[in-house]
């Protein structure tokens, strides 16, 4: 929709210009997607600078171009090509969230945005919150790994946390649809790249921190600092932290008014903070029964949720809704109907055939939590099928091999997005962590690996397929092909 914008006000306080009214349609980062009256944002990229594509943007109809510069002396310089203003903008990437917020009328100021960060659990927590409100008959917007939209009506997205422009655009979209609460997964990449700088968060949730993305952040300290940005530098009203995580314990010391959750009843009773913890817990074949105590009340719920780590996710979700003012008893009454999100601890069961579980776990911590949860609930032998992504953090491969070795009677190494890296090299890196190589089979074809495990295991076993979960593709060097663990398992077990 075309807007007539006062460019002088729009660029204030960053840039002073005499250009007043200008027609603007939307803000875009991709010159190929520019249409008439769009703003083209030319940022530094991994391989190219966006300024190399300004002529394409002009040809496609851009009405104004902002070029990121790291030279402060160039800031505010304006020149024209075919009467189109080209403006240099110092550190544009940092200010893009606020600029986009201006364009989309700062939607987060008029709604409750729940931001979730952590290595694992972001998608599950956002799903629990959305499902809980769905059970109460309310709508909530979702932005995250599984896409964006409302529960059961999601559109796929490329990244967990969208670009600064897309985040503001989506919040504006939800607001126009009278959806006043949005749950957003906030990744370390999104935080480091300033994508959510200008979003007002009603609450920020921290789930956990463990090894991941070291190929990007270089070390765990940098990785933690990226996550910490949500709690230390952005506009947040309520802080909700998992005390069972080591980093969470440290952060609570830095944020004395944070709300604390724990699955261990004696760990947080001493705190005067608002809190929620588990008094008693029983893991069974069909889920988990737990007794909860909190600053809002106590209850006993029987859930279809597996694993202690997912109980943490449930508590964090519960507290997030309580801080928004939802009734404790109403939430507790429908908790038994909560389900896991797509591709998380997805259980397939057919009589006289091994139970098959598909899970997204692709980090050492997530792997260990899923494996230990299966032992806890089912007490069966585990066949683990997994691989590690190519061109990504290599240091976690041997660790994941070691963890699988501890819990599994059989390990099948297979492809999981090898990209441009040699699959043999990836498998060899994983094998370094495995002491008993006699239990290892290498089957590069993921389809053949899954079929082999199901055919050769028995009904007393669990076949655990790790790494992809909801994903529906395999990424190789020169191609991206359709592949879904869940569709394949359905086809094998149910002949569909």
UniProtKB/Swiss-Prot annotation:
EC category: ligase
Residues that, per the record, bind meso-2,6-diaminopimelate: 392, 416-419, 467, 471
Sites bearing N6-carboxylysine, chain numbering: 227
Residues reported to bind UDP-N-acetyl-alpha-D-muramoyl-L-alanyl-D-glutamate: 29, 31, 159-161, 187, 193, 195
Binding-site list for ATP: 118-124
Reaction equations catalysed: UDP-N-acetyl-alpha-D-muramoyl-L-alanyl-D-glutamate + meso-2,6-diaminopimelate + ATP = UDP-N-acetyl-alpha-D-muramoyl-L-alanyl-gamma-D-glutamyl-meso-2,6-diaminopimelate + ADP + phosphate + H(+)
Post-translational modification remark: Carboxylation is probably crucial for Mg(2+) binding and, consequently, for the gamma-phosphate positioning of ATP.
Localization of this protein: Cytoplasm
Gene Ontology molecular-function annotations: ATP binding; magnesium ion binding; UDP-N-acetylmuramoylalanyl-D-glutamate-2,6-diaminopimelate ligase activity
GO biological process assignments: cell division; cell wall organization; peptidoglycan biosynthetic process; regulation of cell shape
Motif Meso-diaminopimelate recognition motif per UniProt: ranges: 416-419
InterPro entries (UniProt xref): Mur-like_cat_sf, Mur_ligase_C, Mur_ligase_C_dom_sf, Mur_ligase_cen, MurE/MurF_N, UDP-N-AcMur-Glu-dNH2Pim_ligase
Cofactor requirement: Mg(2+)
Known role: Catalyzes the addition of meso-diaminopimelic acid to the nucleotide precursor UDP-N-acetylmuramoyl-L-alanyl-D-glutamate (UMAG) in the biosynthesis of bacterial cell-wall peptidoglycan.
Protein name: UDP-N-acetylmuramoyl-L-alanyl-D-glutamate--2,6-diaminopimelate ligase
Taxonomic source organism: Wigglesworthia glossinidia brevipalpis
Gene it is expressed from: murE
């Amino acid at each position: 929709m075309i807007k007539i914008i006062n460019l002088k006000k729009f660029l204030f306080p960053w840039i002073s210009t005499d250009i007043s009214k200008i027609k603007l349609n939307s803000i875009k980062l991709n010159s190929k997607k520019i249409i008439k009256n769009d703003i083209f944002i030319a940022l530094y990229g991994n391989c190219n600078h966006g300024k190399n594509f300004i002529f394409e943007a002009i040809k496609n109809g851009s009405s104004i171009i902002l070029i990121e510069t790291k030279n402060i002396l160039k800031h505010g310089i304006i020149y024209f090509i075919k009467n189109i203003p080209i403006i240099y903008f110092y550190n544009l990437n940092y200010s893009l969230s606020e600029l986009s917020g201006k364009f989309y009328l700062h939607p987060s100021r008029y709604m409750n945005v729940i931001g979730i960060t952590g290595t694992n659990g972001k998608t599950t927590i956002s799903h629990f919150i959305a499902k809980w409100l769905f059970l109460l008959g309310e709508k909530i917007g979702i932005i995250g790994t599984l896409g964006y939209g409302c529960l059961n009506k999601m559109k796929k997205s490329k990244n967990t946390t969208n670009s600064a422009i897309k985040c503001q655009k989506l919040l504006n979209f939800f607001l126009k649809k009278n959806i006043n609460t949005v749950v957003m997964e906030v990744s370390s990449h999104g935080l480091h790249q300033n994508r959510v700088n200008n979003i007002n968060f009603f609450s920020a949730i921290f789930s956990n921190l463990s090894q991941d993305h070291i190929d990007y952040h270089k070390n765990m300290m940098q990785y933690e600092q990226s996550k910490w940005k949500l709690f230390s530098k952005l506009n947040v009203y309520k802080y909700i932290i998992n005390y069972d995580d080591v980093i969470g314990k440290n952060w609570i010391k830095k944020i004395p008014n944070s709300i604390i959750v724990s699955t261990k009843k004696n760990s947080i009773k001493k705190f005067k903070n608002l809190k929620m913890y588990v008094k008693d817990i029983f893991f069974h074949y069909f889920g988990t029964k737990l007794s909860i105590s909190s600053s809002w009340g106590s209850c006993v719920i029987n859930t279809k949720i597996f694993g202690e780590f997912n109980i943490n996710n449930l508590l964090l979700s519960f507290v997030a809704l309580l801080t928004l003012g939802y009734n404790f008893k109403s939430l507790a009454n429908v908790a038994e109907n909560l389900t896991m999100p797509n591709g998380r601890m997805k259980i397939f069961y057919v009589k006289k055939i091994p139970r098959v579980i598909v899970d997204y776990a692709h980090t050492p911590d997530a792997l260990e939590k899923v494996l230990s949860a299966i032992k806890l609930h089912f007490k069966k032998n585990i066949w683990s099928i997994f691989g590690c992504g190519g061109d990504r953090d290599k240091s976690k491969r041997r660790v994941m091999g070691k963890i699988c070795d501890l819990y599994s009677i059989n390990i099948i190494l297979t492809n999981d997005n090898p990209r441009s890296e040699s699959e043999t090299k990836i498998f060899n890196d994983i094998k370094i962590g495995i002491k008993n190589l006699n239990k290892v089979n290498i089957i590069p074809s993921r389809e053949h690996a899954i079929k082999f495990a199901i055919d050769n295991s028995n009904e007393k076993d669990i076949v655990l397929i790790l790494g992809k979960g909801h994903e529906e593709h395999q990424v190789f060097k020169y191609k991206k092909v359709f592949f879904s663990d869940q569709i394949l398992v359905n086809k094998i077990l149910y002949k569909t």
